[in-house]
UniProtKB/Swiss-Prot annotation:
The gene coding this protein: miaB
Protein's name according to its UniProt entry: tRNA-2-methylthio-N(6)-dimethylallyladenosine synthase
NCBIfam families: miaB-methiolase, MiaB/RimO family radical SAM methylthiotransferase
Species per Swiss-Prot/TrEMBL record: Legionella pneumophila subsp. pneumophila (strain Philadelphia 1 / ATCC 33152 / DSM 7513)
Quaternary structure and partners: Monomer.
Domain (Radical SAM core): residue spans on this chain: 143-375
Length: 447
């Protein structure tokens, strides 16, 4: 009988990538097949995120929901991975003794051995060490699951922003060797992948060693990936403005496969707050890089991350952020109210701004961003857009779905053979979270 694996993933795209690798490594080692139903699973994994407020309590709340299932099915193994696992370690076992395995982001490749150790010794096991880049050397060959794929090119972060736990949960920055990344991209392209998404906590700090001993930056890596037969689009996330180099800006002029969209977290428009955050740049320096980029790609769309209500944020600080949002014209943003993360410097800063004020500021910011997004979506009506068809629409199996270069979802009527192809559609309607399009006549016939 085939045994099954259920994975619940919280957090960022890096976690989504890590979860896919957990599934691959356990399929290769133990033949575990993924299921979307937790009640069908023989192994249950929770891949955690520590970015948002009360992350630890949310983990134990989820584990509490699985406790009864485990009691009724004692053969089921439960594992906790990700950043909360890295922070809490064996304390997870103390609070939830029914958990069998605790592992960190850098030790997911050891899951088969941890699983075997748990079964052999009949006691919980914990491995939250930081074995640098070792995990990539022990993962199975990548398996494409559609025309787009995520490729992790580096791990960790060395910026130590005052509000962020990533350096403590994922370790210092370390880049995968250049040729290892290229080999994975070649393998994925041979399996039908047409769009590569390069991942890292601070992806534009990539410094991969080449076979000749030279060091490749992200811009050079992008050039090489663009030359792979079949790869028609490249994206990368998440970037840090401090490391957004001239070489990377020039890549937008030199590599047409580089998507016409950039996610660049600014966090605040106030120099005072940016300094408290230890971001390492000013609002003017951020705007200068955007101006240079727009000289090369005038119509590039930008998204960002913004924290509202950072300790000590005044009305003027918030207005500086709103002014920057207006000037840059961000298309979308992941914006949220600051919450202190244990062990970070910002957690010790005095914070006397009432929560009600923080909520008001967040609402004002999000209203502006929604207005920006709606205005841009409406401006696309009637335009021809090149999209990569990724599959069927979530709402209707009678429609296809894909993404534009600027990362907008487009749903349209069309034949299934178009899945995995780049095609042109005309945008016919703008909805709050997606666009509707019409397939152009020349795309209707099979190739």
């Amino acid at each position: 009988m085939v045994k099954k694996l259920y994975i619940k993933t919280n957090g960022c795209q890096m976690n989504e990538y890590d979860s896919s690798k957990m599934a691959e490594v356990l399929y290769a080692s133990h033949g575990l097949v993924k299921t979307d139903q937790v009640e069908d699973a023989d192994v249950i994994l929770l891949n955690t995120c520590s970015i948002r407020e009360k992350a630890q309590e949310k983990v134990f709340s989820q584990l509490g929901q699985w406790r009864e299932y485990k009691a009724k099915n004692p053969h089921v193994l439960i594992g906790v991975g990700g950043c909360v696992a890295s922070q809490e370690g064996s304390d997870i076992i103390k609070r939830a003794p029914f958990v069998d395995i605790v592992f960190g982001p850098q030790t997911l490749h050891r899951l088969p051995a941890l699983l075997n150790e748990r079964l052999e010794k009949n006691k919980s096991v914990v491995d939250i060490s930081f074995p640098e880049i070792e995990k990539f050397d022990h993962l199975p060959a990548p398996r494409a699951e559609g025309p787009t794929a995520f490729v992790s090119i580096m791990e960790g972060c060395s910026k130590y922003c005052s509000f962020c736990v990533v350096p403590y949960t994922r370790g210092e920055e370390i880049s995968r060797p250049f040729d290892d990344v290229l080999a994975e991209c070649y393998q994925l392209a041979s399996q039908g992948v047409r769009e590569i998404n390069l991942l890292g906590q601070n992806v534009n700090d990539y410094r991969g060693i080449m076979d000749n001993g030279d060091i490749a930056d992200l811009a050079l890596l992008i050039h090489y990936i663009a030359a792979i037969d079949g790869i028609g689009r490249i994206r990368f996330t998440t970037s840090h403005p401090l490391a957004f180099s001239e070489n990377l800006i020039n890549a937008y002029a030199e590599v047409p496969e580089l998507a016409n969209h950039l996610h660049l977290p600014v966090q605040s428009g106030s120099d005072r707050i940016l300094s408290l955050m230890k971001r390492g740049y000013t609002a003017l320096e951020f705007k200068s890089k955007i101006r240079k980029l727009r000289k090369i790609r005038p119509d590039i769309r930008l998204s960002t991350d913004i924290i509202v209500g950072f300790p000590g944020e005044t009305d003027k600080d918030f207005q500086d952020t709103m002014d920057l949002v207006h000037e840059i014209g961000f298309d979308t943003s992941f914006s949220f109210i600051y919450s202190p993360r244990p062990g970070t410097p910002a957690a010790n800063l005095p914070d006397d701004t009432p929560m009600e004020i923080k909520k008001q500021r967040l609402q004002i910011l999000q209203n502006r961003l929604l207005m920006n997004a709606a205005r841009y979506s409406e401006s696309m009506i009637g335009s021809k857009q090149k999209i990569l068809v990724t599959g069927f629409s979530k709402k209707s199996s009678q429609q296809l779905s894909g993404r534009t270069e600027c990362n907008r979802v487009v749903n349209f009527d069309g034949p299934p053979h178009l899945i995995g192809q780049f095609i042109d559609v005309q945008i016919s309607d703008a909805l709050p979270n997606s666009l509707r399009g019409r397939l152009l006549e020349k795309e209707m016939q099979p190739a």
